[in-house]
Protein backbone atom coordinates (compact mmCIF):
# COMPACT_ATOMS: atom_id res chain seq x y z
CA UNK A 1 0.00 0.00 0.00
CA UNK A 2 3.01 2.30 0.37
CA UNK A 3 3.78 2.20 -3.37
CA UNK A 4 0.88 4.53 -4.35
CA UNK A 5 1.71 6.87 -1.45
CA UNK A 6 5.38 7.10 -2.44
CA UNK A 7 4.39 7.59 -6.08
CA UNK A 8 2.05 10.44 -5.13
CA UNK A 9 4.78 12.11 -3.08
CA UNK A 10 7.32 11.83 -5.93
CA UNK A 11 4.83 13.16 -8.51
CA UNK A 12 3.89 16.08 -6.26
CA UNK A 13 7.56 16.94 -5.79
CA UNK A 14 7.99 17.05 -9.58
CA UNK A 15 4.79 19.07 -10.17
CA UNK A 16 5.28 21.35 -7.15
CA UNK A 17 4.75 25.06 -7.87
CA UNK A 18 5.89 27.49 -5.20
CA UNK A 19 3.48 30.25 -6.26
CA UNK A 20 0.53 27.88 -5.91
CA UNK A 21 1.88 26.75 -2.54
CA UNK A 22 2.37 30.32 -1.32
CA UNK A 23 -1.16 31.27 -2.34
CA UNK A 24 -2.71 28.36 -0.44
CA UNK A 25 -0.38 28.04 2.54
CA UNK A 26 0.32 31.68 3.34
CA UNK A 27 -2.93 33.06 1.94
CA UNK A 28 -1.09 35.24 -0.58
CA UNK A 29 -0.96 35.27 -4.36
CA UNK A 30 1.90 36.46 -6.54
CA UNK A 31 0.87 40.11 -6.01
CA UNK A 32 0.85 39.84 -2.21
CA UNK A 33 -2.96 39.97 -1.93
CA UNK A 34 -4.96 37.88 0.52
CA UNK A 35 -7.53 35.94 -1.56
CA UNK A 36 -8.68 33.78 1.35
CA UNK A 37 -9.85 34.60 4.83
CA UNK A 38 -8.59 31.84 7.10
CA UNK A 39 -9.92 33.39 10.30
CA UNK A 40 -8.34 32.89 13.67
CA UNK A 41 -5.36 30.51 13.50
CA UNK A 42 -5.76 29.20 17.05
CA UNK A 43 -9.41 28.40 16.39
CA UNK A 44 -8.39 26.42 13.31
CA UNK A 45 -5.75 24.49 15.22
CA UNK A 46 -8.23 23.69 17.97
CA UNK A 47 -10.86 22.48 15.51
CA UNK A 48 -8.45 19.99 13.91
CA UNK A 49 -7.23 18.42 17.15
CA UNK A 50 -9.61 15.44 17.15
CA UNK A 51 -8.81 14.63 13.53
CA UNK A 52 -5.09 14.81 14.31
CA UNK A 53 -5.48 12.49 17.29
CA UNK A 54 -7.54 10.08 15.18
CA UNK A 55 -4.68 9.83 12.67
CA UNK A 56 -2.24 8.68 15.37
CA UNK A 57 -4.57 6.42 17.39
CA UNK A 58 -3.02 2.97 17.47
CA UNK A 59 0.55 4.21 17.33
CA UNK A 60 0.95 2.50 20.71
CA UNK A 61 -0.09 -0.81 19.13
CA UNK A 62 3.39 -2.30 19.52
CA UNK A 63 3.07 -1.87 23.30
CA UNK A 64 -0.19 -3.85 23.32
CA UNK A 65 1.58 -6.81 21.68
CA UNK A 66 4.74 -6.39 23.77
CA UNK A 67 4.05 -9.62 25.67
CA UNK A 68 4.48 -11.54 22.40
CA UNK A 69 7.73 -9.80 21.41
CA UNK A 70 11.00 -11.74 21.53
CA UNK A 71 12.94 -8.61 22.53
CA UNK A 72 11.34 -5.84 24.61
CA UNK A 73 13.66 -3.31 22.99
CA UNK A 74 11.89 -3.87 19.67
CA UNK A 75 8.65 -2.50 21.16
CA UNK A 76 10.07 0.98 21.72
CA UNK A 77 11.88 0.94 18.38
CA UNK A 78 8.71 -0.04 16.51
CA UNK A 79 6.71 2.69 18.23
CA UNK A 80 9.21 5.44 17.39
CA UNK A 81 9.64 4.27 13.78
CA UNK A 82 5.87 4.07 13.33
CA UNK A 83 5.29 7.55 14.75
CA UNK A 84 8.01 9.21 12.68
CA UNK A 85 6.96 7.40 9.49
CA UNK A 86 3.29 8.33 9.81
CA UNK A 87 4.15 11.92 10.74
CA UNK A 88 6.49 12.29 7.76
CA UNK A 89 4.02 10.79 5.27
CA UNK A 90 1.13 12.98 6.41
CA UNK A 91 3.34 16.07 6.46
CA UNK A 92 4.57 15.52 2.90
CA UNK A 93 1.12 14.68 1.51
CA UNK A 94 -0.49 17.68 3.18
CA UNK A 95 2.15 20.28 2.36
CA UNK A 96 3.09 19.17 -1.15
CA UNK A 97 -0.54 18.96 -2.28
CA UNK A 98 -0.88 22.71 -1.71
CA UNK A 99 1.87 23.27 -4.24
CA UNK A 100 -0.03 21.33 -6.90
CA UNK A 101 -3.68 22.37 -6.50
CA UNK A 102 -4.86 25.63 -4.95
CA UNK A 103 -6.15 25.34 -1.40
CA UNK A 104 -9.83 26.06 -1.96
CA UNK A 105 -9.99 23.33 -4.63
CA UNK A 106 -8.28 20.82 -2.34
CA UNK A 107 -10.90 21.42 0.35
CA UNK A 108 -13.64 20.48 -2.14
CA UNK A 109 -12.09 17.19 -3.31
CA UNK A 110 -14.03 14.03 -2.60
CA UNK A 111 -12.55 11.12 -0.65
CA UNK A 112 -9.93 9.83 -1.32
CA UNK A 113 -8.47 13.24 -2.13
CA UNK A 114 -5.03 11.76 -2.83
CA UNK A 115 -6.50 9.94 -5.85
CA UNK A 116 -7.77 13.22 -7.30
CA UNK A 117 -4.39 14.90 -6.76
CA UNK A 118 -2.50 12.14 -8.57
CA UNK A 119 -5.11 12.10 -11.37
CA UNK A 120 -4.60 15.86 -11.73
CA UNK A 121 -0.87 15.28 -12.26
CA UNK A 122 -0.66 12.10 -14.36
CA UNK A 123 -4.19 11.33 -15.54
CA UNK A 124 -7.00 8.93 -14.66
CA UNK A 125 -4.73 5.92 -14.16
CA UNK A 126 -3.29 7.65 -11.10
CA UNK A 127 -6.70 7.68 -9.45
CA UNK A 128 -7.12 3.95 -10.17
CA UNK A 129 -3.73 3.15 -8.65
CA UNK A 130 -4.49 5.08 -5.47
CA UNK A 131 -7.89 3.40 -5.11
CA UNK A 132 -6.27 -0.05 -5.42
CA UNK A 133 -3.77 0.94 -2.75
CA UNK A 134 -6.63 2.19 -0.60
CA UNK A 135 -8.38 -1.18 -0.78
CA UNK A 136 -5.18 -2.94 0.29
CA UNK A 137 -4.71 -0.39 3.08
CA UNK A 138 -8.24 -0.90 4.39
CA UNK A 139 -7.78 -4.68 4.43
CA UNK A 140 -4.49 -4.27 6.32
CA UNK A 141 -6.04 -1.84 8.79
CA UNK A 142 -8.99 -4.20 9.27
CA UNK A 143 -6.64 -7.05 10.16
CA UNK A 144 -4.48 -4.88 12.41
CA UNK A 145 -7.36 -3.35 14.34
CA UNK A 146 -9.09 -6.72 14.70
CA UNK A 147 -5.98 -8.08 16.40
CA UNK A 148 -5.40 -4.91 18.44
CA UNK A 149 -8.99 -4.64 19.68
CA UNK A 150 -9.02 -8.29 20.70
CA UNK A 151 -5.59 -8.30 22.34
CA UNK A 152 -6.22 -5.38 24.69
CA UNK A 153 -9.16 -6.82 26.72
CA UNK A 154 -7.40 -10.20 26.63
CA UNK A 155 -4.24 -8.83 28.29
CA UNK A 156 -6.20 -6.80 30.83
CA UNK A 157 -8.29 -9.87 31.70
CA UNK A 158 -5.12 -11.92 32.25
CA UNK A 159 -3.93 -9.23 34.68
CA UNK A 160 -7.17 -9.55 36.64
CA UNK A 161 -8.46 -6.10 35.66
CA UNK A 162 -11.20 -7.37 33.34
CA UNK A 163 -13.68 -10.28 33.55
CA UNK A 164 -11.84 -13.60 33.21
CA UNK A 165 -14.22 -14.55 30.39
CA UNK A 166 -12.16 -12.32 28.07
CA UNK A 167 -8.97 -14.27 28.85
CA UNK A 168 -10.19 -17.46 27.18
CA UNK A 169 -7.92 -18.76 24.40
CA UNK A 170 -8.44 -21.36 21.71
CA UNK A 171 -5.97 -24.11 20.81
CA UNK A 172 -3.96 -21.61 18.73
CA UNK A 173 -3.60 -19.10 21.55
CA UNK A 174 -6.06 -16.61 20.06
CA UNK A 175 -8.32 -14.63 22.47
CA UNK A 176 -11.61 -15.99 21.08
CA UNK A 177 -14.06 -14.27 23.43
CA UNK A 178 -12.33 -10.90 23.21
CA UNK A 179 -12.29 -11.12 19.41
CA UNK A 180 -15.95 -12.16 19.35
CA UNK A 181 -17.21 -9.21 21.42
CA UNK A 182 -15.06 -6.57 19.73
CA UNK A 183 -16.05 -7.72 16.24
CA UNK A 184 -19.75 -7.74 17.15
CA UNK A 185 -19.38 -4.10 18.20
CA UNK A 186 -17.62 -3.32 14.91
CA UNK A 187 -20.48 -4.88 12.93
CA UNK A 188 -23.01 -2.79 14.87
CA UNK A 189 -21.06 0.34 13.96
CA UNK A 190 -20.85 -0.65 10.29
CA UNK A 191 -24.61 -1.21 10.20
CA UNK A 192 -25.17 2.24 11.72
CA UNK A 193 -23.35 3.80 8.76
CA UNK A 194 -26.21 2.64 6.52
CA UNK A 195 -28.58 5.05 8.25
CA UNK A 196 -26.52 8.25 8.38
CA UNK A 197 -23.62 9.70 6.41
CA UNK A 198 -22.25 11.34 9.56
CA UNK A 199 -21.79 8.10 11.53
CA UNK A 200 -18.09 7.84 10.67
CA UNK A 201 -17.35 11.48 11.51
CA UNK A 202 -19.18 11.16 14.82
CA UNK A 203 -17.44 7.86 15.60
CA UNK A 204 -13.90 9.09 15.00
CA UNK A 205 -14.58 12.30 16.95
CA UNK A 206 -16.00 10.35 19.89
CA UNK A 207 -13.27 7.69 19.73
CA UNK A 208 -10.58 10.38 19.57
CA UNK A 209 -12.13 12.15 22.55
CA UNK A 210 -12.36 8.90 24.53
CA UNK A 211 -8.71 8.00 23.96
CA UNK A 212 -7.56 11.41 25.22
CA UNK A 213 -8.10 10.50 28.86
CA UNK A 214 -5.93 7.34 28.84
CA UNK A 215 -3.28 9.35 27.00
CA UNK A 216 -3.55 12.16 29.54
CA UNK A 217 -3.30 9.89 32.59
CA UNK A 218 -0.37 8.04 30.99
CA UNK A 219 1.44 11.37 30.71
CA UNK A 220 0.51 12.24 34.30
CA UNK A 221 1.91 8.89 35.43
CA UNK A 222 5.19 9.68 33.70
CA UNK A 223 5.44 12.85 35.81
CA UNK A 224 4.40 10.97 38.97
CA UNK A 225 6.94 8.23 38.33
CA UNK A 226 9.68 10.80 37.70
CA UNK A 227 8.86 12.61 40.96
CA UNK A 228 8.91 9.37 42.94
CA UNK A 229 12.30 8.45 41.44
CA UNK A 230 13.72 11.96 41.17
CA UNK A 231 17.10 10.87 42.51
CA UNK A 232 17.62 8.83 39.36
CA UNK A 233 15.45 10.91 37.00
CA UNK A 234 17.01 12.40 33.90
CA UNK A 235 16.16 15.74 32.22
CA UNK A 236 14.74 13.71 29.33
CA UNK A 237 12.18 12.03 31.62
CA UNK A 238 11.12 15.38 33.10
CA UNK A 239 10.83 16.99 29.67
CA UNK A 240 8.79 14.18 28.12
CA UNK A 241 6.45 13.93 31.12
CA UNK A 242 5.76 17.66 31.43
CA UNK A 243 5.38 18.35 27.70
CA UNK A 244 3.16 15.29 27.21
CA UNK A 245 0.98 16.32 30.16
CA UNK A 246 0.56 19.88 28.90
CA UNK A 247 -0.24 18.68 25.39
CA UNK A 248 -2.75 16.10 26.70
CA UNK A 249 -4.56 18.74 28.76
CA UNK A 250 -4.69 21.00 25.69
CA UNK A 251 -6.17 18.14 23.65
CA UNK A 252 -8.92 17.57 26.22
CA UNK A 253 -9.71 21.29 26.13
CA UNK A 254 -9.67 21.36 22.32
CA UNK A 255 -12.05 18.40 22.11
CA UNK A 256 -14.74 20.50 23.74
CA UNK A 257 -17.18 20.01 26.61
CA UNK A 258 -19.85 18.27 24.51
CA UNK A 259 -17.58 15.39 23.56
CA UNK A 260 -16.45 15.15 27.18
CA UNK A 261 -20.07 14.58 28.18
CA UNK A 262 -20.63 12.00 25.44
CA UNK A 263 -17.42 10.21 26.41
CA UNK A 264 -18.74 9.83 29.94
CA UNK A 265 -21.66 7.83 28.48
CA UNK A 266 -19.11 5.36 27.11
CA UNK A 267 -17.57 4.97 30.55
CA UNK A 268 -20.82 3.88 32.23
CA UNK A 269 -20.46 0.22 31.08
CA UNK A 270 -16.87 0.44 32.29
CA UNK A 271 -18.04 1.34 35.78
CA UNK A 272 -20.18 -1.79 35.85
CA UNK A 273 -17.33 -3.98 34.63
CA UNK A 274 -14.92 -2.39 37.12
CA UNK A 275 -17.31 -3.04 40.01
CA UNK A 276 -17.74 -6.68 38.98
CA UNK A 277 -13.98 -7.20 38.69
CA UNK A 278 -13.35 -5.62 42.08
CA UNK A 279 -15.98 -7.89 43.61
CA UNK A 280 -14.47 -10.98 41.97
CA UNK A 281 -11.05 -9.95 43.27
CA UNK A 282 -12.58 -9.47 46.73
CA UNK A 283 -11.49 -5.84 46.71
CA UNK A 284 -13.72 -3.11 48.10
CA UNK A 285 -14.31 0.13 46.24
CA UNK A 286 -12.38 3.03 47.75
CA UNK A 287 -13.53 6.58 48.45
CA UNK A 288 -11.67 7.75 45.35
CA UNK A 289 -13.57 5.16 43.31
CA UNK A 290 -16.90 6.48 44.55
CA UNK A 291 -15.87 10.08 43.82
CA UNK A 292 -14.97 9.23 40.23
CA UNK A 293 -18.12 7.13 39.87
CA UNK A 294 -20.22 10.09 40.97
CA UNK A 295 -18.49 12.54 38.62
CA UNK A 296 -18.82 10.21 35.62
CA UNK A 297 -22.49 9.45 36.32
CA UNK A 298 -23.40 13.14 36.76
CA UNK A 299 -21.59 14.17 33.58
CA UNK A 300 -23.13 11.29 31.62
CA UNK A 301 -26.64 12.29 32.76
CA UNK A 302 -25.97 15.88 31.69
CA UNK A 303 -24.67 14.62 28.35
CA UNK A 304 -27.71 12.39 27.81
CA UNK A 305 -30.09 15.27 28.59
CA UNK A 306 -28.27 17.62 26.22
CA UNK A 307 -28.18 14.92 23.54
CA UNK A 308 -31.92 14.16 23.80
CA UNK A 309 -32.82 17.86 23.86
CA UNK A 310 -30.81 18.56 20.71
CA UNK A 311 -28.32 20.83 22.50
CA UNK A 312 -25.59 18.44 21.31
CA UNK A 313 -25.78 17.82 17.58
CA UNK A 314 -23.76 14.75 16.64
CA UNK A 315 -25.01 14.24 13.06
Set out the residue ranges of the language-model regions.
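Helix-loop-helix connectors at the membrane interface of multi-pass transporters/channels
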Residues: 1-4, 68-72, 79-85, 142-180, ...
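Lipid-exposed faces of alpha-helical membrane segments in multi-pass integral membrane proteins
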Residues: 3-10, 85-92, 129-136, 177, ...
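Transmembrane helix-loop junctions and nearby membrane-interface residues
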Residues: 9-19, 94-101, 152, 190-197, ...
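TM-loop-TM module centered on a large, flexible mid-protein loop between adjacent transmembrane helices
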Residues: 35, 80-144, 162-207
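Membrane-interface helix-boundary motifs at transmembrane edges
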Residues: 69-73, 197, 227-234, 279-288
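Transmembrane helix-loop boundary segments of multi-pass membrane transporters
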Residues: 129-130, 191-238, 253-268, 314-315
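A generic transmembrane alpha-helix motif of multi-pass inner-membrane proteins
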Residues: 235-315
Amino acid sequence: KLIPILLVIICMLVAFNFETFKEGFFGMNAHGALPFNFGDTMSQVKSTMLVTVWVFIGIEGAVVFSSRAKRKKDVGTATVIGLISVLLIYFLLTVLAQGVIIQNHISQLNTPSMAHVLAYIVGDWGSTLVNIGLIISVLGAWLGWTLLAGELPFIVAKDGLFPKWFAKENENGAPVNALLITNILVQIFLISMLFTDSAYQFAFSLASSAILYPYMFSAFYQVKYTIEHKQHATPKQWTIGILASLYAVWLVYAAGFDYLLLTMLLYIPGLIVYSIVQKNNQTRLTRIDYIFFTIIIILSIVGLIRLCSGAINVF
